[in-house]
From Swiss-Prot:
Gene source species: Mus musculus
Gene: Lmo1
Gene Ontology molecular function terms on file: metal ion binding
Gene3D superfamilies: Cysteine Rich Protein (2.10.110.10)
Lineage, opening ranks: Eukaryota, Metazoa, Chordata, Craniata, Vertebrata
Record domain LIM zinc-binding: where: 22-84, 86-148
Cellular component, GO, one term: nucleus
Keyword vocabulary terms for this entry: LIM domain, Metal-binding, Nucleus, Repeat, Zinc
Tissue: Expressed in the brain and not in the thymus.
Designated name of the protein: Rhombotin-1
Function: May be involved in gene regulation within neural lineage cells potentially by direct DNA binding or by binding to other transcription factors.
Intracellular or extracellular location(s): Nucleus
Any single biological process term in GO: negative regulation of transcription by RNA polymerase II
């Protein structure tokens, strides 16, 4: 398997020369394995170079890794957290590319703007939310809207 670091095109997976053990940037132990990863000008055990969000092994996932805000990320989590520079779907203000965001389908939100648009309830990790007629709703407001027929009259 050949894994390339997108930034400099240098193979991340290397064969370690005998007798010269490198120190792992992840766990600070000597790398005794035959194979090691080199990324961000540091050496890593294959098990130690992981995405800070999903914990996937970056040597297995694909050819690139991403780093931002002192985080090492896989492509999926980098795009999920930082996306591209654009506007918040709730407040329409600019979202800088370095800022963490929330996503719901194609919409991107500031963390502070990701709340029920009827009652302003903020969501915590794991909370259920609904996207109806391009509005973020908590479960209570979503169910009330269905019961009283509000959403049927707002079909877009």
């Amino acid at each position: 398997m050949m894994v390339l670091d997108k930034e400099d095109g240098v193979p991340m997976l290397s064969v370690q020369p005998k007798g010269k053990q490198k120190g792992c940037a992840g766990c600070n132990r000597k790398i005794k394995d035959r194979y090691l990863l080199k990324a961000l000008d540091k050496y890593w055990h294959e098990d130690c170079l992981k995405c800070a969000c999903c914990d996937c092994r970056l040597g297995e996932v694909g050819s690139t890794l991403y780093t931002k805000a002192n985080l090492i990320l896989c492509r999926r989590d980098y795009l999920r957290l930082f996306g591209t520079t654009g506007n918040c779907a709730a407040c329409s203000k600019l979202i800088p590319a370095f800022e963490m965001v929330m996503r719901a389908r194609d919409n991107v939100y500031h963390l502070d703007c990701f709340a029920c648009q009827l009652c302003n309830q903020r969501f915590c990790v794991g909370d259920k939310f609904f996207l109806k007629n391009n509005m973020i709703l908590c479960q209570v407001d979503y169910e009330e809207g269905h019961l009283n027929g509000t959403f049927e009259s707002q079909v877009q």
